[in-house]
């Protein structure tokens, strides 16, 4: 009986505590909505821009005490409250003629999304920050579905500014991003390689170097190898263009021309020179065709240099110094 009595008392206490917490939360929600009502009396559902849609987002979740109110972002805006023709302290709308400076808009966001709270952010001094890009250039805070956070639509947000990359990603060889007009399902997003909020690496890369970023997916190319290929060790960008190419495997140009950017002399061993392929044999890797040469050279057909040098990223074979095995 004593045990049952104690259980009953504990249950009653839990119920009372839950009821008190719910009442307190309800009071907080009402207080937050009342504070917003100063703004939503005018900025209501009749506006062309879906102002009230923010209540369908984490920023408008009034059950969350961390969620900001209207004036948390737009400032006290006392002048706007007394005279509608006066702008709020901070104006975010890109279409507005009274748009606040990027620094003011970003400061409103960073008041909560601080680098001390969110270590992933290296915003101050980043390329985006230095070029006057605001958080709201990419994020639509009032929209319940933010395009930049969706795998299916993120690329289109980035391509609004990065138009050269929009064209490149439509080339024959490209990473599988979601692009309007291309039906393949997305397997990657821009933020898989780039951190738009800032980075310690070049080009806002998520890793400290180009190679480390590429190796996150292409781990088989990482090595270490017994025989290293110096351009590969230096940077993947020596041979590849990451956003799209008219050549296979995102190559900057096709072999043998790509190889000849470094290997400009005669072929070291003169093997497969084409000397036994017919008329007009060519004996150097640079001599694509001498006078009267009509035969197709083994060095130029199909994958060209890669016909023999198949492990071009590096080899662990004891006899793999030429990357042939």
Could you describe each region identified by the protein language model?
Residues 8-19:
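Bacterial N-terminal signal peptides
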Residues 1-5:
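N-terminal secretory signal peptides that target proteins for export/translocation
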Residues 21-325:
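Short sequence/structural segments immediately N-terminal
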């Amino acid at each position: 009986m004593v045990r049952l009595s104690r259980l009953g008392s504990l249950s009653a206490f839990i119920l009372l505590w839950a009821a008190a917490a719910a009442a307190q939360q309800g009071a907080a929600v009402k207080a937050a909505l009342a504070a917003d009502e100063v703004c939503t009396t005018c900025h209501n559902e009749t506006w062309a821009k879906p102002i009230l849609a923010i209540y369908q987002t984490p920023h408008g979740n009034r059950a969350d005490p961390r969620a900001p109110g209207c004036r948390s972002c737009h400032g006290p805006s006392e002048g706007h409250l007394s005279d509608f023709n006066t702008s709020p302290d901070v104006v975010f709308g890109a279409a507005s003629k009274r748009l606040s400076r990027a620094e003011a808009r970003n400061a409103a966001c960073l008041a909560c999304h601080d680098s001390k709270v969110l270590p992933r952010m290296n915003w101050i001094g980043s390329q985006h920050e230095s070029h006057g890009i605001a958080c709201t250039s990419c994020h639509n805070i009032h929209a319940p579905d933010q395009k930049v956070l969706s795998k299916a639509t993120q690329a289109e947000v980035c391509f609004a500014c990065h138009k050269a990359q929009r064209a490149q990603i439509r080339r024959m060889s490209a990473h599988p991003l979601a692009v309007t007009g291309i039906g393949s399902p997305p397997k990657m997003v821009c933020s898989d390689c780039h951190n738009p909020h800032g980075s310690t690496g070049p080009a806002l890369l998520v890793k400290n170097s180009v190679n480390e970023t590429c190796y996150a997916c292409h781990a088989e190319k990482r090595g270490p190898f017994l025989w290293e290929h110096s351009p590969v060790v230096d940077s993947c960008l020596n041979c590849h263009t990451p956003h799209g190419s008219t050549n296979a495997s995102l190559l900057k140009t096709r072999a043998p021309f790509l190889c000849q950017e470094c290997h400009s002399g005669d072929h070291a061993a003169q093997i497969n020179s084409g000397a036994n392929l017919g008329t007009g044999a060519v004996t150097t890797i640079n001599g694509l065709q001498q006078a009267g040469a009509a035969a197709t050279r083994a060095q130029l057909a199909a994958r060209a240099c890669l016909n023999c040098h198949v492990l071009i990223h590096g080899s662990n074979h004891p006899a793999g110094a030429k990357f042939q095995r």
